[in-house]
């Protein structure tokens, strides 16, 4: 009896293990930010998209295909020409993600590596078409407008293939060596012209100052001559007295200066009898 009991327990355990293995092989998980499409060996890709969570499928008949639907970055370098035939090196940074409802169509037409098949194709096409409408200088001064136009046209093209572009930006923009040298030479010429203009303006200011100074001297001379004509020697005597007063004031402020009156008895003020 005991042997039969344990034999049954073993058989039940084996059955449970087999059943657990079968059930486990029929389960699959869809993580957050992902979606799944089911490939059936008899009917092909099913139209319904499976959301996040744990789901059942028929082993050996069905196969889940997982897609990441979160935004992913990609850089697309492009070499193209501007409207004035200048070589332009541009790097386009794109944030993209698939449209969940379009995943069965995306897998059927493009496969899981849809981004590798589509973005390197449509990004250069759109970018070259837009850049060809601008001169090299406009690409610098109107960079935001160029980026907006590329974003609009590229978004429309990407939607045709079943995915969304969340952000598009021009992260790198350089020109050929010839254009770079031309820009540098233009900047040097502008600096030299600015310097020359400053020198000319300075000379004009100096010339104007000299003219004003000469006019002032001439006017002062005229007034002085008029004063001499009206006052005669009195004005000269007044100026002499003013100059003498100024000299006396300056000497009075100096130390060690003695004042000697005019005359013969200037030393110690001695009487004349002693001198005899």
From Swiss-Prot:
Entry's Gene Ontology BP terms: cellular response to hypoxia; mitochondrion organization
SMART domains: PHB
Record keywords: Developmental protein
Annotated SUPFAM superfamilies: Band 7/SPFH domain (SSF117892)
Pfam family, one: Band_7
InterPro entries assigned: Band_7, Band_7/SPFH_dom_sf, Prohibitin
Keyword set includes Acyltransferase: no
Coiled-coil regions, chain positions: none
Gene3D superfamilies, per database record: Band 7 domain
A Gene Ontology cellular-component term: mitochondrial prohibitin complex
Function text: Required for larval metabolism or for the progression of the larva into a pupa.
Family per record: Belongs to the prohibitin family.
Record's protein name: Prohibitin 1
Species of the source: Drosophila melanogaster
Gene: Phb1
